[in-house]
A protein has these predicted regions:
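Conserved structural position within tetratricopeptide repeats
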Residues: 10, 41-44, 74-78, 112
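Alpha-helical segment of the N-proximal tetratricopeptide repeat
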Residues: 12-48
Length: 145
């Protein structure tokens, strides 16, 4: 981990480190605590960055700190009420807590401003399916296509 090498003063540690990219890599590897450390360092370089904060919330969720994850998602939404990722993540945390009504609001907000990108379709389909189930509608995922 780059932050560890930098702390120990190993060769190359003085180079500019992309803590966000490092955190994303660690998150993909399942090294959630290490990812959280890297994202916190990225946040120091870009205080309040909603993208970094959403990654922190994901890391919190993966290590079981769902209350911290919820707080972080809510903080993002205070800064940017259209942050699709925060609506998505918070919706599923709320569902785990039995807060279906509030989760519906966040799923609707997510679907009003869905993300684009390689993984977006999977998340949009999942949100549509979940919303249909919560509303008691038939689960036809392809009705909007």
């Amino acid at each position: 981990m780059t932050w560890w090498k930098k702390l120990l003063g190993e060769d190359g540690a003085s180079d500019k480190v992309d803590y966000y990219a490092e955190g994303a890599d660690l998150l993909r590897e399942g090294r959630f605590h290490d990812a959280l450390t890297s994202f916190r360092l990225a946040l120091k370089e870009a205080p309040g960055d909603p993208v970094v904060l959403q990654q922190i919330a994901i890391a919190y969720t993966r290590i079981g700190q769902t209350e911290e994850a919820s707080k972080t998602y809510r903080h993002v939404l205070q800064k940017d009420p259209t942050a699709a990722g925060a609506h998505y993540g918070l919706a599923y945390l709320l569902l785990r807590q039995g807060e279906a009504d509030e989760a519906v609001q966040h799923l609707e907000a997510f679907l009003q401003n869905p993300p684009s990108g390689p993984d977006a379709g999977e998340h949009v389909s999942h949100a549509r399916s979940t919303l249909a189930q919560l509303r008691g509608e038939p689960g036809n995922l392809f009705s909007d296509l």
